[in-house]
């Protein structure tokens, strides 16, 4: 039982940590490309900004789904029935 709980805790930590890391990298790339596009064509900056916010919302949504799955694994422990 302790092994399953320990492995579940490690899986939850990896899921949340990798989700946060992926989101940070994604936001960095997204912001950099937005600034690059706005510097090249300043007249398109408002349109690019709207698209950037839509993609940023989707990027956050993927991370929140991962956090939800991690919390589900942590508190319900679906692997406990294997014992």
Swiss-Prot record:
One of its GO terms (molecular function) is proton-transporting ATP synthase activity, rotational mechanism. It is found in: Cell inner membrane. The chain crosses the membrane at residues 10-30, 52-72. The record marks 60 as: Reversibly protonated during proton transport. It holds the Pfam family ATP-synt_C. Keywords: ATP synthesis, Cell inner membrane, Cell membrane, CF(0), Hydrogen ion transport, Ion transport, Lipid-binding, Membrane, Transmembrane, Transmembrane helix, Transport. It is a multi-pass membrane protein. GO terms for cellular component: plasma membrane; proton-transporting ATP synthase complex; proton-transporting two-sector ATPase complex, proton-transporting domain. InterPro entries: ATP_synth_csu_bac/chlpt, ATP_synth_F0_csu, ATP_synth_F0_csu_DDCD_BS, ATP_synth_F0_csu_sf, ATPase_proteolipid_c-like_dom, F/V-ATP_Csub_sf. PROSITE patterns: ATPASE_C. Belongs to the ATPase C chain family. HAMAP family: ATP_synth_c_bact. F(1)F(0) ATP synthase produces ATP from ADP in the presence of a proton or sodium gradient. F-type ATPases consist of two structural domains, F(1) containing the extramembraneous catalytic core and F(0) containing the membrane proton channel, linked together by a central stalk and a peripheral stalk. During catalysis, ATP synthesis in the catalytic domain of F(1) is coupled via a rotary mechanism of the central stalk subunits to proton translocation. F-type ATPases have 2 components, F(1) - the catalytic core - and F(0) - the membrane proton channel. F(1) has five subunits: alpha(3), beta(3), gamma(1), delta(1), epsilon(1). F(0) has three main subunits: a(1), b(2) and c(10-14). The alpha and beta chains form an alternating ring which encloses part of the gamma chain. F(1) is attached to F(0) by a central stalk formed by the gamma and epsilon chains, while a peripheral stalk is formed by the delta and b chains. This is ATP synthase subunit c. It comes from Shewanella denitrificans (strain OS217 / ATCC BAA-1090 / DSM 15013).
């Amino acid at each position: 039982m302790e092994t399953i709980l320990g492995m579940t805790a490690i899986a939850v930590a990896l899921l949340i940590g990798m989700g946060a890391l992926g989101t940070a990298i994604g936001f960095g790339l997204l912001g950099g490309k937005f600034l690059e596009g706005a510097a090249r064509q300043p007249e398109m900056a408002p349109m690019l900004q709207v698209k950037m916010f839509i993609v940023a919302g989707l990027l956050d949504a993927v991370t929140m789904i991962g956090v939800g799955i991690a919390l589900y694994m942590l508190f319900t422990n679906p692997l406990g029935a294997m014992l």
